[in-house]
Every structure is written in structure tokens, then in C-alpha cells.
């Protein structure tokens, strides 16, 4: 490397001025959040243009023991139509020229439902969770703001709805019979019933919780109906003597 590159004139000429300084942004068309199929090649390997294209924006994390990126995130990347997408490590170092002050970096944000691969820990970085494949062709990590990254993680970490268990008629009959005997069966009774109807004990426990809630609602509604009926009977009984008096007066008027 020529020594003239380290001269004071070259260093000062390469430094951007405050007025002309432009914040570095990721290329919009050259760096979408889609990785072509590498076929075993390293993402940061020397072959091809991958290292030169992404090296400035996605520094190479080193896993414990000297393992590179393929060993760290190779198992976390998902394949879809010859594309790999997974956990993207976006460098959030302070940007902007030194003379104007740097923008504070993003804190370490990580989706709690996605395991962190080795080599991806550390402050000053944001871990973007896997996103649906429908969004990949239209996304660019370099253009996402701090709020958008947080919303993306929240969208991915949204709790999925559990599958509802469908019970057969025989299972429902056995569960209902035990419920009529006792509203709060112990663990041994639940396990015995679970083996009998070919269910897990957790499913039986959840069914009893839901059945008790339904039973309490029915009991509450029936008590309210009985109270309303009593109130109606009282009002009707109070009104009946008055009606009799009115009927008697009407009879006397008709006789006269």
C-alpha cells in the first residue's frame, strides 16, 4: 500500500465536511433482506462479490471456538424458493460525521421467542427476527427506522393462537360423568381418566377448568333468573288486591 495514502492531505481530503456530510445508508436495490442460495458458501467468504457487497453493513460475527457465521446461523436460516432468510444482524453503530455528533445507536433488541445464535450477542446491535416470506422482496434493512424495527419484532413475536382440541363423543361423555361426581378431581384421578380416554393429563385439566367456568356462569344466570321471577311474583301479588278493588267498584257501578 503506498505511503502517500496516509499523508495528512489525503486524510483531510477524505474527511467529509459538516455541511456536505451525508449519513451513510445501505444501498436500496443492492441489499434487500434476501440472501440468494449460497450452496454451502460462506456469507462472508472470499469467493464472489458477497463479501465486498455486505461487509460494510453486516460485520462478520465470530462464534465461540472460532466458528464462523455458517456454524452460527446456518441452522436458523430458513429456505424458501432458493432464498435464505433468518436472523439478520444489523450493525447499529453511531452514524454521522464526528464533528457534528453521532446519532445514539440502537440498543440490543431481540425477539424473546427466537433463540440467539452464538456470536450475535453484544451491545450496539439489533437482531431482526425472521419475517414472512411475502415481505422479503419489499424490505430493506437500511431504510427501516428504529420504530419500524421494533414493530417488526413485535409483529413476529405476537403470540400465536393455540389449536383447539376436538373431543370425541366418548371422551366428552367420560369427562362429563367425572365432572358430575366431582368438580375438582385430583391429579391421580385426572391421569386415570386421561389414560382411559387416550388424552393427556394437561388436556383433561384444561377441560375441567373450562367446564367449571361454564358451570359457574350457568349457576349465576339461573340465580339471576330466580331472583327476577321472585321480584315479578311480588309485584304481581301487590297489584292483585288493587285490581280486585277496582273490579268490585266497577261491578257496583254497573248494578246501580
From Swiss-Prot:
Instruction: Name the GO terms of the biological process aspect.
Output: anatomical structure morphogenesis; dorsal/ventral neural tube patterning; ear development; embryonic skeletal system morphogenesis; forebrain development; middle ear morphogenesis; muscle organ morphogenesis; negative regulation of transcription by RNA polymerase II
User: Which domain of life does this protein belong to?
Assistant: Eukaryota
Induction info reads: By activin.
- Name where it's found: Nucleus
Annotated SMART domains: HOX
Tissue-wise expression = In early gastrulation, expressed in the dorsal lip. In later stages of development found in head, limbs and body wall. In the embryo, expressed in the postotic cranial neural crest cells, the frontonasal prominence, the first branchial arch and cleft, and specific regions of large joints.
The UniProt annotation gives the DNA-binding region as 160-219
Task: List keywords of the entry alphabetically.
Answer: Developmental protein, DNA-binding, Homeobox, Nucleus
Q: Which family does it belong to?
A: Belongs to the paired homeobox family. Bicoid subfamily.
Q: Any idea what this protein is called?
A: Homeobox protein goosecoid
Q: Which organism is it from?
A: Mus musculus (Mouse)
Q: Quick one: which gene encodes this?
A: Gsc
Amino acid at each position: 500500500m503506498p505511503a502517500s495514502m496516509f499523508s495528512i492531505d489525503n486524510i483531510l481530503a477524505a474527511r467529509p465536511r459538516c455541511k456536505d456530510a451525508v449519513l451513510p445508508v445501505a444501498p436500496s436495490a443492492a441489499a434487500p433482506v434476501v440472501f440468494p442460495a449460497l450452496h454451502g458458501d460462506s456469507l462472508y467468504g472470499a469467493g464472489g462479490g458477497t463479501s465486498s457487497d455486505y461487509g460494510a453493513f453486516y460485520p462478520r460475527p465470530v462464534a465461540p471456538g472460532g466458528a464462523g457465521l455458517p456454524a452460527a446461523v446456518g441452522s436458523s436460516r430458513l429456505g424458501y424458493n432458493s432464498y435464505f432468510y433468518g436472523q439478520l444482524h444489523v450493525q447499529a453503530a453511531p452514524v454521522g460525521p464526528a464533528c457534528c455528533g453521532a446519532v445514539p445507536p440502537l440498543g440490543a433488541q431481540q425477539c424473546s421467542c427466537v433463540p440467539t445464535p452464538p456470536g450475535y450477542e453484544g451491545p450496539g446491535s439489533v437482531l431482526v427476527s425472521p419475517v414472512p416470506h411475502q415481505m422479503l422482496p419489499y424490505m430493506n434493512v437500511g431504510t427501516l427506522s428504529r420504530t419500524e424495527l421494533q414493530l417488526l419484532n413485535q409483529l413476529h413475536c405476537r403470540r400465536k393462537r393455540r389449536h383447539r382440541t376436538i373431543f370425541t363423543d366418548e371422551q366428552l361423555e367420560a369427562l362429563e360423568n367425572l365432572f358430575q361426581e366431582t368438580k375438582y378431581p385430583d391429579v391421580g384421578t385426572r391421569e386415570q381418566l386421561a389414560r382411559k380416554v387416550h388424552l393427556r393429563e394437561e388436556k383433561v385439566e384444561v377441560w375441567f377448568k373450562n367446564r367449571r367456568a361454564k358451570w359457574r356462569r350457568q349457576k349465576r344466570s339461573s340465580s339471576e333468573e330466580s331472583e327476577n321471577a321472585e321480584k315479578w311474583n311480588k309485584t304481581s301479588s301487590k297489584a292483585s288486591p288493587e285490581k280486585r278493588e277496582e273490579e268490585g267498584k266497577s261491578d257496583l257501578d254497573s248494578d246501580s
